[in-house]
């Protein structure tokens, strides 16, 4: 208990500052602070090529003396095996120019600081666990639905890794070709969940960006159907206490209620849990940290390496 009290005091002290990098496929967000209520500076910029983008991050962080550690919540796939020669590297990403890019090593060498790294969704999950919608939970999922789909899982109070890290966006869900003849947009699998339900897939299927589709458009029923199919699988496999859904596509207010309703229907009464059947509005929720979940997750990753 004394250690936990010491750790809590240290992590929440305004004198202990950490660097945080939310490394996304379209933008990077850099911040320095100690928690949600103590962000000293923040900067965001477009993701270009690795040398330029990493250079801008380093220039930002090098303005601050006395940082204790740096956390990186990054798009992937990532090599997260500590014993691997390519630990902390982006591997087989479809993001042009970023294949086999060292992230953790580049920042550690340049700054001489400990670096914590994980996927963007695992980082956001950690942030929600520390400060947001998953506080006091041991088992939950964090999903992001945007230009890609990713998921982070907490099981028994720990982020799930394993051989690699979960790729929840690349599971297969039933695809009714008669109702939805769209072939899918995933360059690896075609009509996996990511290929059917990202913002990119919606734009290619319907010929316009998701945010421009009206509330009553059939796109939203179909989107909710695919997402609920995935959630039903996750519920049956991982039995989470809560599911948090973020990302640009989920910012459309009509979508979350549709997903909840379809999830309850798809489970068919088999999972007899009042949390789902009677309180779905508290079971499938939006991130409490909103758009800050990623960068605050990176901050939590920095704190975790001390």
Residue ranges and their predicted role:
Residues 135-194:
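Glycine-rich phosphate-binding loop of actin/hexokinase-like ATP-binding domains
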Residues 72:
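Conserved phosphate/oxyanion-binding catalytic-loop motifs
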Residues 1-69, 78-86, 105-113, 127-137, ...:
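ATP-binding/phosphotransfer module of carbohydrate and carboxylate kinases, centering on a glycine-rich
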Residues 115-119:
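General beta-strand structural signal in soluble alpha/beta enzymes
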Residues 122:
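Short alpha-helical segments enriched in small residues
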Residues 43-44, 95, 164:
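Short clusters of small/polar residues that mark proteolytic maturation junctions
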Residues 75:
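Conserved NAD(P)H cofactor-binding loop of Rossmann-fold oxidoreductase domains
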């Amino acid at each position: 208990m004394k250690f936990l009290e010491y750790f809590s005091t240290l992590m929440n002290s305004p004198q202990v500052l950490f660097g945080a990098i939310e490394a996304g496929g379209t933008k990077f967000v850099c911040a320095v602070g100690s928690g949600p209520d103590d962000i000293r500076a923040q900067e965001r910029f477009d993701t270009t090529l690795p040398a330029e983008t990493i250079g801008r991050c380093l220039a930002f962080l090098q303005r601050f003396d006395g940082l204790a550690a740096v956390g990186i919540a990054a798009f992937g796939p990532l090599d997260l095996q500590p014993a691997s020669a390519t630990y902390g590297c982006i591997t087989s990403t479809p993001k042009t120019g970023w294949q086999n890019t060292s992230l953790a090593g580049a920042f550690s060498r340049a700054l001489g600081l400990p670096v914590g790294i994980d996927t963007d969704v695992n980082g956001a999950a950690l942030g929600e666990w520390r400060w947001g919608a998953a506080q006091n939970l041991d088992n939950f999922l964090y999903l992001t639905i945007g230009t890609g789909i990713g998921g982070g899982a907490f099981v028994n109070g720990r982020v799930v890794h394993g051989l690699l890290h979960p790729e929840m966006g690349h599971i297969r869900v039933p695809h009714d070709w008669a109702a939805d003849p769209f072939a899918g947009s995933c360059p690896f699998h075609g009509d996996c969940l990511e290929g059917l339900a990202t913002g990119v897939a919606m734009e290619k299927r319907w010929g316009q960006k998701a945010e421009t589709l009206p509330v009553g458009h059939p796109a939203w029923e179909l989107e909710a159907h695919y997402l609920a199919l995935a959630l039903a699988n996750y519920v049956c496999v991982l039995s989470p206490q809560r599911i948090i859904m973020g990302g640009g596509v989920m910012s459309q207010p009509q979508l979350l209620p549709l997903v909840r309703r379809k999830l309850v229907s798809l489970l068919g009464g088999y999972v007899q849990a009042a949390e789902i059947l009677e309180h779905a509005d508290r079971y499938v929720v939006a991130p409490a940290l909103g758009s800050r979940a990623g960068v605050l997750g990176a901050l939590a990753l920095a704190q975790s390496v001390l």
